[in-house]
């Protein structure tokens, strides 16, 4: 359903999900907002459970694939969260778009196995700036791409390097870094 809210999608006919994109249905307690928030943070938490199993990067290509999948899923979820719950792209008076890295972003959920202390994890659970969130997404997707090198996914339900590169491209397009996209 987020595709309908994208920059290049217009829907003129009646449909069951049109109400989700009306301004009256954007309150914090509305079902779509709650579903998006809960689903995406569940993805982050499940990815963190997998990341927590690894004290260091594994050498086995299958285990590297599992860890790479977890980092890619967390990057993907945070990428959607920042787009749904903050508008990081702003226009100046001339209509030129840019990223305001100082705007409030979203809470980041990380693990102690990544080197964070409990105090740091607690402080990241508050709203971080858009810049901090973008830095975390870029770090996660970069790590995922590195870990997925040489990994052959068993089916299309699993992320491989090409899929992670697609997530990275979407991130860099949003971040207006055309050369990296």
Where does each model-flagged region fall?
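Acidic, glycine-rich segments characteristic of secretory precursors and extracytoplasmic regions
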Residues: 1-6
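Short, helix-capping/interhelical loops that line the mouth of catalytic, cofactor-
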Residues: 10-31, 107-128
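Conserved, well-structured interaction surfaces
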Residues: 16-88, 128-132, 143-151
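Extended ligand-binding groove/face enriched in aromatic
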Residues: 69, 76-116
């Amino acid at each position: 359903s987020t595709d309908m809210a994208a920059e290049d999608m217009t829907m003129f006919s009646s449909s069951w999900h049109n109400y989700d994109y009306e301004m009256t249905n954007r309150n914090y307690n509305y079902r779509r907002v709650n579903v998006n928030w809960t689903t995406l943070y569940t993805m982050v938490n499940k990815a963190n459970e997998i990341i927590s199993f690894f004290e260091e990067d594994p050498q086995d290509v299958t285990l590297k694939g599992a860890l790479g999948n977890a980092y890619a899923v967390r990057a993907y979820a945070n990428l959607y969260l920042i787009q749904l719950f903050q508008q990081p792209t702003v226009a100046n008076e001339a209509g030129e778009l840019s990223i305001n890295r100082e705007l409030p972003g979203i809470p980041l959920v990380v693990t102690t196995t990544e080197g964070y202390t409990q105090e740091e994890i607690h402080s990241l659970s508050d709203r971080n700036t858009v810049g901090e969130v973008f830095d975390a997404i870029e770090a996660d997707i970069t790590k995922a791409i590195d870990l997925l090198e040489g990994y052959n996914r068993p089916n299309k339900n699993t992320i491989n390097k090409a899929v992670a590169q697609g997530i990275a491209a979407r991130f860099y397009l949003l971040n207006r870094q055309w050369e990296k996209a």
